[in-house]
Amino acid sequence: MDLNTILIIVGIVALVALIVHGLWSNRREKSKYFDKANKFDRTSLTSRSHTQEEMVQPNNISPNTYVENGHTPISQPTTEKLPSEAELIDYRQSDKSVDDIKISIPNTQPIYDMGNHRSEPIQPTQPQYDMPTANNVASMTLEQLEAQSQNVGFNGINSSSPELRVQLAELSHEEHQVDYNLSFNEPKAETTAQPKQTTGYIQLYLIPKSSEEFNGAKLVQALENLGFILGKDEMYHRHLDLSVASPVLFSVANLEQPGTFNAYNLAEFNTIGIVLFMQLPSPGNNLANLRMMMRAAHTLAEDLQGVILTEEQEIFDANAEQAYLARV
């Protein structure tokens, strides 16, 4: 028999031995498991039923639940879970056991006995405040209250007192109260509205800024650009429809006597100033016509480097303009 055959036989024998050993070990472990399971059912359940039968009797377990041989329990469907051992404690003994408890620290004497102090409930003690009376607080100033709060220390002032709150609020209200009882019966300066001007003339003056005079040719050109037409009484007029046939809104006259413009000598004409005037009542709306005359005066002042004056020969500023508009 050669070496290869011997090795094959030895390997097969070893393999068979391993298989047999594994099966035997598996059966032994399984037998031990089932042995422990049967022993647990037999001892734990039976001992529990004997020790707890005086305390609680399960509703769904009958005395004939187990067979006489005691090997296999007969299981029956139950709707309620069996109470655990923690739930089966006799709570009637809890008060007595609590009384016997003593709390102590190692190497020291017991410092508290639950049984001796059980019948004596601890009464909460309320701190005593050295409070000033409400009348005194009400009469104090803010500085005195702050000093009092510092002197009382940790306890402070009991601001939760309703009476104290009311009196402090009244005191603060009296200190900060402002007398709003104004007398409305006092005579007031009556602002009488200025009566509207319905007749007469409204005038504006335009003069040069320097001592020079207005050049006639430039003046005529500026007037014609604004729609003025030389017409009646040898004056320039601003008509409603820019035609001689339409009504005159306002006019321009020469400040030099006789106040006319020489139509035949305009090239050599010079003047110290002109006056714009509007006769009331004017055609259409007096206020609209006055605004138009004011705009014409401002345009002429820019073109001719002039200054606008009021009827009182004062500078025609924004206030004077509002006063003119208020007249109509």
Curated annotation (Swiss-Prot):
Listed HAMAP family: ZipA (MF_00509)
Mode of membrane association: Single-pass type I membrane protein
Polar residues bias: start-end ranges: 57-81
Cytoplasmic face residues: 26-328
Keywords recorded for this protein, A-Z: Cell cycle, Cell division, Cell inner membrane, Cell membrane, Membrane, Transmembrane, Transmembrane helix
Subunit-structure text: Interacts with FtsZ via their C-terminal domains.
CC terms in the record's Gene Ontology section: cell division site; plasma membrane
Family annotation (Gene3D superfamilies): ZipA, C-terminal FtsZ-binding domain
Subcellular location(s) per record: Cell inner membrane
Chief place where the protein resides: membrane
Record-linked SMART domains: ZipA_C
Transmembrane regions: 5-25
Pfam families: ZipA_C
Keyword NADP appears in the UniProt entry: no
Biological role stated in the UniProt entry: Essential cell division protein that stabilizes the FtsZ protofilaments by cross-linking them and that serves as a cytoplasmic membrane anchor for the Z ring. Also required for the recruitment to the septal ring of downstream cell division proteins.
Hydrolase listed as a keyword: no
Full protein name: Cell division protein ZipA
Region (Disordered): 44-82
Biological processes per GO annotation: division septum assembly; FtsZ-dependent cytokinesis
